[in-house]
A protein has these predicted regions:
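NTP-dependent small-molecule kinase module
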Residues: 2-10, 31, 35, 143-182
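Conserved lysine of the Walker
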Residues: 25
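A glycine- and Lys/Arg-enriched "phosphate-lid" helix/loop adjacent to the NTP-binding pocket
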Residues: 57, 103-147
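ATP/NTP phosphate-donor binding region
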Residues: 177-273
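C-terminal charged capping/lid subdomain of soluble metabolic enzymes
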Residues: 352, 358-361, 459-535
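Active-site segments that bind and position negatively charged phosphate/pyrophosphate groups
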Residues: 374, 378-487
Length: 535
């Protein structure tokens, strides 16, 4: 169905380009895919790859009927990839192809006859058209124009201007269904946030010469990993799959060595990549493997927990544990892309989902106060629903906070320390409780503790403390702690990485939304602990 007013519709993936020879389908398709950050495929390329011979050789060996059957299969395969697709000019002559495009967004690039003749006359690889471009194009237009009009979602006119202008017009009409949050710095990348993000978003971030990927995941995610692998294999990639023990047990040198062996077995090259599917333990471990194999290859993070989406998977930190402590072995290795598909959250245990909100609330206090306003103005039932629009906005905003901070300070030399708001005490609670407390639960207590320290320092008011208590409570997180003694907690705090020359250093707020690091005396910390009933 043709749409007369382009501005009245929104396009979505998969996105198919059709048109006569010379219309610019492949060039515009590549430009659009690059701007959207997804894969592009030309069905003629798929046909040649699967057949192992050129299009002209297929016509010689199998005649047009054999080629069209291959083309039908290629179109179905391309549509399943969910990216940008450029069809051969005659593909729509097959009824099966037209049927496959019924529910797909199809852009018909229409070019006036004289301009089309000018274009194809310059193309040395079109011998048939070169003999009589005017007559042949008139014939093709008569035969195919009704078929293009049958399948088109929208028709765009192309003149003698650059293909980039047509591509820009298409991109303006596309609704990806997900948001891209940019992380800047020396190694920039995007975080894609939304539902049902297709495999084309993974491929769009890989190097153009990548041919192999190693998927690393925890055992409970074997089905999800297989789904991703199937999609990548459909697109021609060699895929290896490796599991690791769930949780912190997977962050060991033995596990990493086994993953290195798998990378070696696959002969992963510099152009290839590791894909991490899982929570923070997976992104930490797989990221370290990617950072160290061949001194660094590509990494795609697909976090499946809320905590990993808003924290571990974004920022470029990788690491494993040792007998000396957690995350002491690692390096900074930014990913090529992060795919935060919110569909994964629907199967996340409720306690893990709630704990992940701890980092979200923290981001509201240190940087984006709109997060707090959303939490304060949203029904608590919606705050516990992973599919609510409010949760999606909260996640997007929390990721944007981290992206903004990491863009300015990847290696935690200054600004990035503000992301540790609430973490000094939180890490101590986690360790003293043998990690039976979830990270986000401990962060809630740690932020309330830090807010009280802010009052002692004259940086915050009692009302600001109450706002902390209310925000963390509304999402279901604890705001008090009555476990081990404060002396035991203090011993752990004194070993915190932020301690300098025996001085405690806490991230505090000088007003909501304005975080910085302060030196705190043990007496000040004890005063607050006593006030909160931590003996």
């Amino acid at each position: 169905m043709s749409v007369s007013s382009p501005s009245s519709i929104r396009l979505h993936l998969p996105l198919v380009f059709v048109g006569l020879p010379g219309a610019g389908k492949s060039k515009v398709g590549r430009l659009v895919a690059a701007q959207l950050g997804v894969s592009h495929v030309d069905t003629d390329d798929l046909i040649e790859k699967s057949a192992g011979k050129s299009i002209s050789q297929i016509f010689m060996d199998e005649a047009e009927q054999g080629f069209r059957q291959r083309e039908i299969r290629a179109v179905h395969q391309a549509v399943q990839m969910g990216g940008v697709i450029s069809l051969g000019g005659g593909a729509v002559t097959s009824e099966e192809v037209r049927d496959a495009l019924r529910d797909v967004c199809v852009v018909h690039i229409h070019v006036e006859h004289d301009e089309l003749v000018r274009r194809v006359t310059k193309k040395a690889h079109r011998p048939l058209l070169r003999e009589d471009p005017d007559g042949m194009l008139r014939q093709l237009r008569r035969e195919r124009l009704p078929l293009y009009e049958e399948v088109e979602t929208i028709r765009l006119e192309s003149d003698d201007g650059p293909a980039s202008e047509v591509a820009d017009r298409v991109v303006d009409l596309v609704d990806l269904g997900w948001k891209r949050i940019h992380v800047g710095g020396d190694a920039p990348y995007d975080v894609c946030v939304g539902h049902s993000i297709p495999v084309s978003a993974i491929v769009g971030a890989l190097r153009s010469d990548a041919s192999k990927v190693l998927i690393v995941h925890a055992q409970p995610l074997v089905t999800k990993a297989r789904e991703v692998a199937n999609g990548l294999e459909t697109m021609g990639f060699e895929v290896g799959i490796a599991t690791h023990p769930d949780g912190e047990a997977g962050k060991s040198l033995d596990v990493v060595a086994r993953l290195w062996d798998e990378a070696g077995r696959m002969k992963l090259g510099r152009a290839d990549a590791v894909i991490a599917i899982g929570g923070g333990a997976t992104t930490d471990t797989a990221g370290f493997v990617a950072a160290t194999w061949l001194r660094g290859i590509g990494l795609i993070n697909i976090p499946t927990t809320l905590l990993a989406m808003v924290d571990a998977a974004v920022g470029g930190k990788t690491g494993i544990n040792s007998s000396a402590g957690k995350n002491l072995i690692g390096c900074f290795h930014p990913p090529l892309r992060v795919i935060a598909d919110l569909d994964y959250l629907s199967s996340l245990p409720e306690k893990d989902f709630v704990a992940g909100l701890g980092e979200v609330v923290k981001c509201g206090f240190i940087r984006d106060t709109e997060i707090l306003r959303i939490i304060e103005g949203t029904d608590t039932n919606l705050l516990s629903d992973p599919r609510s629009s409010q949760i999606r906005e909260l996640i997007e905003r929390a990721i944007a906070v981290k992206a903004d901070v990491v863009s300015a300070d990847l290696k935690e030399s200054g600004l990035r320390e503000i992301l540790n708001y609430g973490h000094t005490l939180a890490h101590a609670i986690e360790k003293c409780e043998n990690f039976s407390w979830r990270h986000g639960e401990a962060v809630g207590v740690g932020c309330v503790f830090a807010a009280h320290l802010g009052v002692v320092r004259g940086l915050l008011t009692d009302a600001d403390v109450e706002r902390h208590v209310s925000a963390f409570s509304r999402v279901g997180l604890p705001i008090t702690y009555s476990g081990t003694s404060f002396d035991e907690l203090l011993d752990v705090v004194l070993s915190d990485k932020k301690v300098r020359a025996g001085q405690l250093r806490f991230v505090l707020l000088d007003g909501i939304g304005n975080a910085a690091t302060y030196r705190i005396s043990p007496d000040e910390a004890r005063q607050v602990a006593t006030r909160l009933g931590i003996a």
